[in-house]
């Protein structure tokens, strides 16, 4: 399916997968309204401030996006984060609340606000994670949030069945973005260690998966795409090259 002339809304668009997807959508002729807290880093046709954890910010974002675009053909729910890698007993409610409000409440909120404006033939894409398919140690809040996103995508597809709106989740493993920097409080040494000794997936490669789903024929729904580095079989199992 051709994307030229379509309208897209993208969250979490200031870096990484979000920024790469915005770029590739625009290269395909899509007009993109994109948002992030660091709006100065967003490069889209319409760049808007957005905090998905804040109802007023989210409402203003969607209203402005729809006013500029006139309707939505593609929604990419990409905003999300993880904080820390500690056993659950060492986690705090503040950290858990931040992760769940961003990754779960924010996704539901943006979807609810956008859905009335999604046109026939539209497509809603969720940025999931292999953490939403199989747990690993010391990541309870993030894992719970991504299982929730996967469950919501299933439920939304059931609710939209019979309407010409497709729903896809892209579940990624290790992708070299600012994700690990955020997770470890901008500790570059800890973040770099996540990707040491292997070739991680790149943001462009995940964006390619998003566009692959979007460009299938309208009668085809790719429910899920799982993308991982060759060296990773699950969230907890990674084979690294010997640094020696």
Model-derived features: where do they sit?
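Conserved glycine-rich cofactor-binding loop
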Residues: 7, 14-15
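The beta1-alpha1 cofactor-binding region of Rossmann-like NAD(H)/NADP(H)-dependent oxidoreductases
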Residues: 50-60, 93
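Substrate-binding pocket helix/loop in short-chain dehydrogenase/reductase
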Residues: 86-88, 95-98
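Active-site helix of classical SDR
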Residues: 111, 145
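Alpha-helical segment proximal to the catalytic Tyr-Lys
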Residues: 116, 158-161
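Residue(s) in the substrate-gating loop at a strand-loop-helix junction
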Residues: 129
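C-terminal helical subdomain
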Residues: 169-170, 188-236
